[in-house]
């Protein structure tokens, strides 16, 4: 085992991990937020243009530009969460989620889609924040200063709503980049292994990121794994090393999410047997309670602040 059987080291590792995460956050998170905020400002500006400064929120606009819906939700008083808009419009959550990814559901009939969009537009128009959009009730053109202020407020709301994912995604990219750098320095090659091929046929000395791994027998499904590594000298069972990159900015969130990896390792072992393992790559606020739970579920981990433990993991 790597760290799961060494509880005497856990407290020191937790403290070191928290320090590393906090330093990264202070150094990098503001830039990640600023970069995303600029993209958000651009999205809001486009939404203003498409809706004639929020005076024409129509199904046609949403059909042509589904992703605009996220900006419109932040233009109401109060700003509306996804589920709240679904409830108020008696709509479809899957439709809303698909639209905010920039797409429309291909299998939904046209008349059904039109009905849903019309209801959404009615709710958004009724709840439009008139303290921001002074020009809406009067029918007068928006003054440049009023328009700029409204766009800034909506952009701040939208960016604030996605602040946590911004930071989490930036941290995940950084963690995978560290793993890649470590592997390349040891002669590994980055090469995708198709989910349609048996997992134990992965080429030795290769690795891939965000790879789908098949689980289940009667009803096979793909589950995503952050990093899959086949050592230069594979294990006798030929199964690669599976790694999940995990980061957390507070202790509360990790305790809420700790069952996710336990479920994943159980799915993997049902499919591939007890030989397969899932290693966590941890940075941030993972306390001894989280570690004890993970160890009891058959999980092991490598700390980012001691990345060379990947060797002990088999890489």
UniProtKB/Swiss-Prot annotation:
Catalytic activity from the UniProt record: Endonucleolytic cleavage of DNA to give specific double-stranded fragments with terminal 5'-phosphates
InterPro entries: Restrct_endonuc_II_XamI
Tree of life domain: Bacteria
GO biological process, alphabetically ordered: DNA restriction-modification system
Keyword Hydrolase assigned: yes
GO MF annotation list: DNA binding; type II site-specific deoxyribonuclease activity
EC number, UniProt record: 3.1.21.4
Name of the top EC class for this enzyme: hydrolase
Alphabetical UniProt keywords: Endonuclease, Hydrolase, Nuclease, Restriction system
Signal peptide start and end residues: none
Protein name, per record: Type II restriction enzyme SalI
Organism of origin: Streptomyces albus G
Gene, per the UniProt record: salIR
